[in-house]
Amino acid sequence: MSALLSAALLVGLPAAHAQTAPPTPAAPSTPAESAPPAAPSAVPTAPTLTLAQTLTLVRASPGWRSADLQYRSAQLSLDSARARAGLNVTVGGDASLVKVPLASGDWLSNATLTAQISASVLPWSATFEGVRIAERALNRAGADLRDARVSLVVQAVRAYGAAREATAGAALAEAQVALAARQLEVARAQRAANLIPELALQEREGALQSAQNAAAQARTSVALAARGLANLLGQSVTLPSTAAAFDAVPPAPAAPADVDALVTRALLARPEVIRAAAQLADAGAQQRAAQLDLSLPDLSAGVQYGQLGSGTGSAGRTVGGNLNVKSGVAAAQISFPLRDPGETAKTGLALSLNASLPVFGSGKGTALTSANVSQQAAALALESARQSVDLDVRQKSADLLTALDRVEEATSALARAQASLTSTRARLEAGLVTPLDVTQAELSAAQAQNALNAATANAYVSSLLLAQASTELDPTLVNPAF
């Protein structure tokens, strides 16, 4: 079987290389003449693409960079929200020029410098809530970033395996064409000797045509696999010319662990659940804000000390502060006139308290009702997300079990093909079959081995998908020995 595999890969070399590297003109030649030109074409300038290189390239792909940028945007939004929640300093000034009475009075000028410092001090302040919203958004972005990276890694592993499988399939298809051509030559000789009917010869011709069509489709599959890998990586790639040049297929994974434990883990870290939980928290914050807006009066208290102005004079140097209970913002002010107010300004203390409470027609009750409905909808969305995650993990676990069953089936099929090959070789030694029958048995065994490789690779990808669904997969720890 190893001899046939080597022959199949050599036969498939020109076809696979034509799909993964720039085409080179070649004149028709006999099989014996086609071997020498293979040496220079088998020395490409680009290195053989390995899975480790693929995983390195995917970290520079557009999808990876886009996920990084989205997370960075969430970080900047949080920094901006925290900056808005800090101290705010405002400096201003005003100037006036007054003449009273207009006909006989003197021009009096005055200029005042003012400064104000304000900050949010109560927990329900809008700026504090903005920080909490930005923190939840960053948490969502972090979960989305991790999921995007894991998804890209799994896609890269799957695309690399698909390219390997397509290349192996193309080589086997070319080997099938060569075998069908030899069988047709024998059939023509038998027909010339009138040993078989014309219908048998036509069947051989049809078999060759079918093999050629299958080989063409296999070459197209190689091209599509290379294109899909290039689209994922965001750059052109050169695939290995033969399946043997790819990284080896990994061993079959173990059966999934306790599904309930995987579901429990997924419910804590899946981005869908984190996103829905954050939306519920946002809806709860809106509901609390609407409740406070309805129940708290618009209350503000202030104090001012310094050279307070009388009814006929201007104020002098003053300091003061105020607190708005509803907005949760406290502020301190200082006023410094550039002109001495004189005797009219006396040192004193002023206290103020303002309050207003809407009684009818404010619409705040409607806003609270709407916020309650939004909170209930968000709670339902969270429950739906949790159920979806539960179902997804259990489905991925079932898919892995199915893939492992197919590995066992492919292993049994390979054992049967190898037993048939051994029997056919023994029958050849006894003179009961022809060498073409042995070649057909060797090709069948090679196809069974390729089917086992494909089933094993599919089981490996299924295990990665389950690990992704249960949030156990770390994109930095994926085994590159594929």
Task: Set out the residue ranges of the language-model regions.
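A glycine-/polar-enriched beta->alpha junction
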Residues: 56-65, 72-88, 115-133, 142-150, ...
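Heptad-repeat amphipathic alpha-helical coiled-coil interaction surface used
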Residues: 66, 71-73, 78-80, 131-133, ...
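Bacterial Sec-pathway N-terminal export signals of envelope proteins
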Residues: 16-90, 120-121, 237, 243-286, ...
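Acidic, low-complexity, intrinsically disordered peripheral segments
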Residues: 20, 24, 30-32, 382, ...
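Gram-negative bacterial Sec-dependent N-terminal signal peptides
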Residues: 1-17
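Small/polar, glycine/serine/threonine/aspartate-rich low-complexity segments that form flexible
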Residues: 38-47, 90-126, 130, 246-255, ...
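Amphipathic alpha-helical coiled-coil segments and their boundaries
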Residues: 53, 58-60, 67, 120, ...
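Periplasmic alpha-helical coiled-coil/stalk elements that build and connect Gram-negative outer-membrane
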Residues: 148-269, 279, 399, 403-407, ...
